Amino acid sequence: MKSVKININSIDKVKKFVNVLTKYDGDFDLVSGHYVIDAKSIMGIFSLDLSEDIELVIQDDVEQEEVLKAIKDFLV
């Protein structure tokens, strides 16, 4: 498991972020305060405060480095 901070503060960034993550089979969570949502869920993401940085938790260690490279544009 790995945790990183991301910034997806626009509709376009959210769409691109979800499109990247849906290419992977692993489980990804977004944590904002006490809320934890599925990072592949556009509706769930829009329930968060996108003006703040959000914590992405990558549950699958196998694809971890590949996923981090794919989301490098969103990392804080």
Give the ranges of each region predicted by the language model.
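Amphipathic alpha-helical interaction surfaces in cytosolic regulatory modules
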Residues: I11-D27, Y35-L50
